[in-house]
Amino acid sequence: MREWFTRAAVAVALMPTPAFADELKIDDLVVANTIPAPQRDATVNAAKGFYQFWNIGDEALLKAAISPDFTDHTLPSGRPQGPDGPAFASKTFRAAVPDLSVEVRKMIVAGDYVTVHMVFRGRFTGTFGKARGEGQAIDFIATDLLKVTNGRITDNWHIEDNLTLLTQMGVAKVEQ
């Protein structure tokens, strides 16, 4: 069974995708073999576009990847709901970490759902609230669960390692 998933993952990785999605590096892509090819391709491309948006900040990628009915089920305080939320989050975070990049370590596609484990990296050279960056290295993990319908992301549940992020920024201190 695992061998079949591996072959399917290789096939998906080799299929043609939009140019923006080709730029995104995914370390490990696993796709369930029960997904019809058109749905599989649309789902993988939506997810790739979404994470390429996070990788480079181009809002055209975001608009192509998410539905107008997008819902963030783990909406942080102060972030707008809907399609404007990820754009707001990206702008806010890029003000603190202008060279922000994302590496997708694992993407698992099963039916309408995509689970993604990623690493965000960059240097804190901007501002975050009252904190001013001094070039600190930023390197923290996050995991998303996306629902994709008709090739567009409709729902997102996400969790980020904010303690590591805030500690790296010097905003939080962990006493041992």
Residue ranges and their predicted role:
Residues 1-8:
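Bacterial N-terminal signal peptides that target proteins for export
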Residues 8-9, 19:
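Cleavable N-terminal signal peptides
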Residues 21-64, 68, 174-176:
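Short, low-complexity N-terminal intrinsically disordered segments enriched in polar/charged residues
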